[in-house]
């Protein structure tokens, strides 16, 4: 009877130990994934920075990815060039305003 009690007592310990190794492996995979996401985040173009050469490389904002917005600039010499920057489109600003207002009301 004593041997059965010892085995029953050790069984949950062994199960928790084996599952914790699986969790450690999962955490290591998540850490590698987060490091890869951080690397991509460093490569993206921040808000208000020029994106003329890479129009799809803008970073993510709070809720939406910034969009590359372009304008035509006329220099003093009279030549036209296109200049682009990463920014938040007006409809995204409105959505962020509504969500922020909703968070203040509903907590």
Swiss-Prot record:
Task: Return the domain comment text from this UniProt entry.
Answer: The presence of a 'disulfide through disulfide knot' structurally defines this protein as a knottin.
Give any Pfam family that matches: Toxin_35
InterPro entries with a match to the protein in the record: Spider_toxin_CSTX_knottin, Spider_toxin_CSTX_Knottin_CS
Q: Which residues form the propeptide?
A: 21-41
GO MF annotation terms: toxin activity
Q: Which GO terms describe its cellular component?
A: extracellular region
Tissue-wise, where is it found?
Expressed by the venom gland.
Q: Which family does it belong to?
A: Belongs to the neurotoxin 19 (CSTX) family. 04 (U1-Lctx) subfamily.
**Taxonomy of the source species:** Eukaryota, Metazoa, Ecdysozoa, Arthropoda, Chelicerata
> Its domain of life?
Eukaryota
Task: Give the keywords, sorted.
Answer: Disulfide bond, Knottin, Secreted, Signal, Toxin
Q: Please name every pair of cysteines joined by a disulfide bond in this record.
A: 44-59, 51-68, 58-86, 70-84
Stored PROSITE patterns: SPIDER_CSTX
Protein name in UniProt: U1-lycotoxin-Ls1b
Q: Where in the cell is it found?
A: Secreted
């Amino acid at each position: 009877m004593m041997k059965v009690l010892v085995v029953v007592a050790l069984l949950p310990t062994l199960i928790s130990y084996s599952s914790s190794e699986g969790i450690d492996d999962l955490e290591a995979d998540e850490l590698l994934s987060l490091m890869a996401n951080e690397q991509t985040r460093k490569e993206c173009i921040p808000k208000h920075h020029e994106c003329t050469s890479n129009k799809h490389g803008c970073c993510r904002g709070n809720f939406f990815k910034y969009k590359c917005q372009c304008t035509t600039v006329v220099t003093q010499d009279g030549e036209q060039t296109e200049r682009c920057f990463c920014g938040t489109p007006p409809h995204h600003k409105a959505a962020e305003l509504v969500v922020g207002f909703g968070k203040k009301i509903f907590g």
